[in-house]
Amino acid sequence: SSKPSLNYRLAVLLTSNEEGEPEDGKIDVIIKKFMDQGEHIDFCLVGEPSSNKKVGDTIRIGRRGSLSGTLKVLGKQGHVAYPEKVENPIFTSAKLISELESITWDEGNEHFQPTSFQISNIKSGTGATNVVPGVLEMMFNFRFCSESNEAHLKETFEAVLKKQNLEYEIDWVLSGLPYLTEKKYFIEQIVNSVKSVTGYEPIINNGGGTSDGRFLQVMGSEIVELGPLNETIHKTDENVSLKDLDTLKGIYTNLLERLNSN
């Protein structure tokens, strides 16, 4: 028997440079080319490893944004035996970190957990035991929900720096804004496909890091993330079982057939 024809156009977008800094090969470059050509993506299924314990047990319909910064707290270098002649940036940073850690940035909402602030790296000192350093460098990150925005987070953070009368330098990098798919149609089709293939209904959880789904929001696309287990992501020997891939293939196939019949 002949295979049914598709009543929609199907495209597969592959990134060759997900983790790298250069622009070539990133999904946002592809999306820009699509938009320049007048193309529009109605529905986008992102194969991000969303599943927790079983394939398809969790889907994501949004993600928090990511705002990173590198802060240099400036002091005055000198000998540890002459405290009156030094300004120790480690001491001043300790007070700063304590205050930043105590801030409730927002309360989150029904779709997202509250905005979180984390410090990922701290570097200071010469390696000598008798020298007070002249600078402390701290790298940090906000994972922010739709209750906060870039300007609010920067303003609040730098207000603490000024309140403590610190001399500092700071660089900010916004790597992604929050996004949320609020239309129900595509979500319902994916939920039904998971139930049809696996027998269980997925939960919706918008936690985790950023994903390439954020690049599609400029098109107004309906975006849902559904992929393999995330147990080993970014670990040594990262892997996906062939059985899980087969289940995922079944869900994807069911979804394509379901969309074609509707």
Residue spans for each PLM region:
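Acidic/histidine-rich catalytic neighborhood of metal-dependent amide-processing enzymes
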Residues: 1-62, 260
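Metal-dependent amide/peptide-bond hydrolase catalytic core
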Residues: 49-54, 61, 67-262
